[in-house]
Swiss-Prot record:
One of its GO terms (cellular component) is cytoplasm. Residues 977-1043 are annotated as: Disordered. This is Integrator complex subunit 3. It holds the Pfam family HEAT_Ints3_C. Keywords: Acetylation, Cytoplasm, DNA damage, DNA repair, Nucleus, Phosphoprotein. Residues 1008-1022 have a biased composition (Acidic residues). The modification Phosphoserine is found at residues 502, 537, 995. It comes from Pongo abelii (Sumatran orangutan). Component of the integrator complex, a multiprotein complex that terminates RNA polymerase II (Pol II) transcription in the promoter-proximal region of genes. Component of the SOSS complex, a multiprotein complex that functions downstream of the MRN complex to promote DNA repair and G2/M checkpoint. The SOSS complex associates with single-stranded DNA at DNA lesions and influences diverse endpoints in the cellular DNA damage response including cell-cycle checkpoint activation, recombinational repair and maintenance of genomic stability. The SOSS complex is required for efficient homologous recombination-dependent repair of double-strand breaks (DSBs) and ATM-dependent signaling pathways. Component of the Integrator complex, composed of core subunits INTS1, INTS2, INTS3, INTS4, INTS5, INTS6, INTS7, INTS8, INTS9/RC74, INTS10, INTS11/CPSF3L, INTS12, INTS13, INTS14 and INTS15. The core complex associates with protein phosphatase 2A subunits PPP2CA and PPP2R1A, to form the Integrator-PP2A (INTAC) complex. Component of the SOSS complex, composed of SOSS-B (SOSS-B1/NABP2 or SOSS-B2/NABP1), SOSS-A/INTS3 and SOSS-C/INIP. SOSS complexes containing SOSS-B1/NABP2 are more abundant than complexes containing SOSS-B2/NABP1.
Amino acid sequence: MELQKGKGAAAAAAAASGAAGGGGGGAGAGAPGGGRLLLSTSLDAKDELEERLERCMSIVTSMTAGVSEREANDALNAYVCKGLPQHEEICLGLFTLILTEPAQAQKCYRDLALVSRDGMNIVLNKINQILMEKYLKLQDTCRTQLVWLVRELVKSGVLGADGVCMTFMKQIAGGDVTAKNIWLAESVLDILTEQREWVLKSSILIAMAVYTYLRLIVDHHGTAQLQALRQKEVDFCISLLRERFMECLMIGRDLVRLLQNVARIPEFELLWKDIIHNPQALSPQFTGILQLLQSRTSRKFLACRLTPDMETKLLFMTSRVRFGQQKRYQDWFQRQYLSTPDSQSLRCDLIRYICGVVHPSNEVLSSDILPRWAIIGWLLTACTSNVAASNAKLALFYDWLFFSPDKDSIMNIEPAILVMHHSMKPHPAITATLLDFMCRIIPNFYPPLEGHVRQGVFSSLNHIVEKRVLAHLAPLFDNPKLDKELRAMLREKFPEFCSSPSPPVEVKIEEPVSMEMDNHMSDKDESCYDNAEAAFSDDEEDLNSKGKKREFRFHPIKETVVEEPVDITPYLDQLDESLRDKVLQLQKGSDTEAQCEVMQEIVDQVLEEDFDSEQLSVLASCLQELFKAHFRGEVLPEEITEESLEESVGKPLYLIFRNLCQMQEDNSSFSLLLDLLSELYQKQPKIGYHLLYYLRASKAAAGKMNLYESFAQATQLGDLHTCLMMDMKACQEDDVRLLCHLTPSIYTEFPDETLRSGELLNMIVAVIDSAQLQELVCHVMMGNLVMFRKDSVLNILIQSLDWETFEQYCAWQLFLAHNIPLETIIPILQHLKYKEHPEALSCLLLQLRREKPSEEMVKMVLSRPCHPDDQFTTSILRHWCMKHDELLAERIKSLLIKNNSLPRKRQSLRSSSSKLAQLTLEQILEHLDNLRLNLTNTKQNFFSQTPILQALQHVQASCDEAHKMKFSDLFSLAEEYEDSSTKPPKSRRKAALSSPRSRKNATQPPNAEEESGSSSASEEEDTKPKPTKRKRRGSSAVGSDSD
């Protein structure tokens, strides 16, 4: 297999030095268009990205050809210093050489490392773009070199390489055992295995890698080569699951689903035994399988098992294809991805993706677009394997089993009920099978948790009725098309839903929660899975595409989307004649330049002194209708350069913004244009984030971001914060790429509005992917973005505790990129409960282990309530014992003595006055006792240190009998220390008789001997006699006093 040879060459090159090649030259031998990046034919148009990369490569080649290495380096560095565009050209040129010229790869990588001024950010972004958009057309040689380059980036520890690895993993298709796919799976696995220490630094990468390879293990069986790969995958997953289980816990309930599929593999059998019978062996914070099953899986994980091409085409079907015209699309998808026996396992991935990721808006739901339930019905009916069919049904109902209305979304459970409802007439067998599965899964999923599963399914059905997805379930459960046994079982399991005689009615709702609705579909149910005329383009990509990664890059062959003609007739009669003529010219304008000229004339007329301001509302209505296409289209160019940004703001609408930027704020014309924008904003809220984009992208608007504040105050909202949040929310829903592009400038220009709460942060982390997270982290570290400040970071992180797991990890990653002392947020510990907040506890624990224990840190750690299942405090104390034992001993001594000195009444008053836990003496002693037990079988001598023993003596001398009894083993350490210590001179004893501890030490020799004797005698006894022993010591001390 040629690609395997390439892999070997790449690996050899990675280990080589000097001018050794990058390997993989043999892989592309004889490929069409040799030396080029992408496969193409003579009929294909030249790819824009390829042209640009080849241009950059020719610049580098012209500068380095025929000169010495030193001269070449000098020339490259001199060129890079000229500015950012030149820096980008050289980086991309060297990057292209690495991909196309294996023999020069090692040298080019060294040059790239030397000239890069942005931590390889340009190269990382370009790799992500190629993987997401061009990988299927990439030449074999370039694929091999891309793997080689990623391996080098990982070896060099380049920040952001983890994001590239995750994008690479996304390209590994499930259910595909072709040579190229197996090569890719093995190549990425080799990188992750070789660079294991690097992998362990990224929690998200650990979880994503485990999720990916657990899923792939199922596909790899049969041949010796696949078995060998499978064993490597098993070893990799098992090692990460056992060593970093808390990081894997962020996957949520789908981790259990994947582990069930591999449960018969011996290594996973042993892991299952620990998960069920000994969860603490995996992590002190893991309480059992229920903890996993009650955690919803983030859409990031569900999406990672579909390749970009699959995802794009599936999204196209659910947003562009009309119901009744889907057959050719489905046939194409079937031929491309589901035609082999091995590919049947992909159906689960597709169903989980549709349920958990594809959540259409109410606008799409109420249209005639192909609904989700129809695609799932097709996937179920076309399944050719019994095992795959069972797994597909489990995937469909998986979120039902432990559904909680507070944590889970109605959109995750809605497809299953609608598949059953709509299949009853055309495919009753499908409905019967699914209802039977729903009943039988309750006792059979996991018998010890049968009660939880029953409650989950009941909550799902109840929520479906409450949200009016179906008004009643009785017509579905009591339908005469079902056999008697099944109907009896449904009545037995769900009597609450079998009482209403009303016919099934699906209701349109206006709630924010999106629902499926019946409306247009009733007459098409007969053929809901396999109808009509339409087709995918067989081209993997549309060469003229512009836009974000997940935009649709292919179109129907027989149907094209026809824009409905804009009708502004109702408004024209209300306009002055001259303005009406100009608006009509704007409507008829064929090119952007002509429209811009007319738009400028309209603005000029608005600014004339005799303009009737009452016409602003009508004019705004006309403009909103005329620019509908502009608001639907892409805003941010695919290639972000100064030229492309300037070109993107050359649209007619943006002329209003440009005129606004050229005016003084105290000018009456300025107010008039703001009023026009305010009217437009009422009719088209997207105008807000378009203004933000213009102020960010246009050179004419440089330094004018404060205009947005004037705009916000001119709107009906009248408030900057509310307006900004609404506009960013609209941007988040329309274009995540644009949201990420705007984020640095929004945080920089409006710090008071963005940094005081977590509202904007939550919007961002809810939609970004791993590559975009890495990009934001880079912005923070380069000083371009500040998302947290000391005075509000604690409150924001506390707010984040209610977010989804992946969102919380993103928030913590962004926080850790800032240079904010950990002590600033350490009080969050008092808000964290070990069952409810594992994400925050894991991140905080991993950060605390890098810090030296300050008194405040130790105080907060010790103030956590003691619980046998909460190992947080013991874990970090143990780590500090190993690394900073003397410092920790001093901190604990200080806290013990302080808390022991506080009057008891004052302590209880203080603790009752606050809802948050206060540090008490008993808490400290409980945590120390747990630590003592944890260190019992180690060589660590933490409790033999003088400060700890002195502090324990101090506490023992003044605490009550109940505490002495409870912590007798702990206090016995101090007694042994006292017995072994040298007695102080007589003169010092006399001077110190006023303190209880001194009086205790002043015990007369006969009593001391008696104490020693009783101590040695009690070594073979139980700990119960010890309080009695202390009483004897206490009485002797009193005797000393009386003397």
